[in-house]
């Protein structure tokens, strides 16, 4: 789940999401799962030989429902539907891709996670199914790496918080820009009083090998961890100054391509 105060897919006629409306919530919006890269509002997908780039650039006014803006690259179900579509298209339409760079189109912000205002106005059923869907999308990224030979690199050009960092954790490698302010964070506990809802704590310990005591400290530190400390705690694989960031990502990408092709 996430951090910030603020979630796309164009609503077209389709199956209506189910959920009982309660006081303070809005009716579930009509959701269409039919999309393709030419219709994405929040992602850009490009393929160059064995390398693909997925850029998250969320349209603030592109939420599935009224009542919230998708600020700071936060996401709602519509954003994640596009991500799911892109991951599966890479597997089936571009099987020759060996490395996928997941990055942001916003300055100093990778992703602030699930949109809090969207969650606040949603029904309980919607929240549960939203978390399940986002989990399945991140599992799909890991499955593409394990079984389709497509490794993912999270190129964090800015802060990755809450569900934004959980998205990065689904990738094979994480590179964080070292600009003095960009951090990785799971601030759900100190800010919202809830546990991360998209596998963050499990992946920290089981996938990345973060020490449990450090994971506990990290999950109760609202401001997150920056720079070399993030690498020392195994929260990221490498940091790079902004001037060197593109070259470092290219190096990681080329190594992964060589490993997967070789």
List the model feature ranges, each with a label:
Residues 105-106, 110, 141-192, 218-219, ...:
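Glycine-rich beta-to-alpha active-site loop
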Residues 1-14, 24-63, 166-170, 211-262:
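Amphipathic alpha-helical segments at domain termini/boundaries
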Residues 49-56, 76-125, 135-155, 177-181:
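A structural preference for short, pocket-lining loop segments at secondary-structure junctions
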Residues 199-214:
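Hydrophobic, secondary-structure "cap" segments at the distal end of domains
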Residues 58-75:
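A solvent-exposed, charged loop/short amphipathic helix patch at secondary-structure junctions
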Residues 127-131:
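A glycine-rich helix N-cap at a beta->alpha junction
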Residues 89, 136, 203, 229, ...:
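Alpha-helical scaffold segments in soluble metabolic enzymes
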